[in-house]
Amino acid sequence: MEGTEKGRHSQSGQPNDMKRRENDMKEHGMENPMDLGAFSISLTVKDLAASQAFYDKLGFTTMGGDAAQGWLILKNGDHIIGLFQGMFEKNMLTFNPGWDQNAQPTAEFTDVRELQRRLKAQGVTFMTEADESTTGPGSFVVVDPDGNPVLVDQHR
């Protein structure tokens, strides 16, 4: 749809919620909203091959991973699912700073340690933390109020 991505407008031509939020934050002297990077859902699976076959039927194709190590990344359009056998206890929302939805590096991104500092300043409790004395790859996990883990995993 024309103007949807670039201008972030709804079908009615009005700015969407994200644009309104950006404007509200700017008016109050706050930084831009957090750019968490590419979004996917990471699913714990009992049988990687059976899960892959199921999601193939929904139009997903394998774009990465290593079945021998128990994980695959599947894609359908802009939608990404990670299948993980024996790696996680629960399904997780996953964000990858520095990547776009095609797992390609973005020109600019907010480092995972900066995201962590911002969330700590807002009182968010962490399940795991990125080592703030390092650079490059790092990750942290927070848990939402309903117990859903959210992984922020930077690969570069």
Task: State where each predicted segment sits.
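Core segments of cupin and vicinal oxygen chelate
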Residues: 35, 42-87
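Residue-level structural signal for beta-strand termini and adjacent loop
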Residues: 68, 86, 132, 153-155
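Short hydrophobic/aromatic beta-strand element in the GNAT-like acyltransferase core
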Residues: 71, 80, 92, 139-141
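Vicinal oxygen chelate
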Residues: 2, 8, 46-49, 87-88, ...
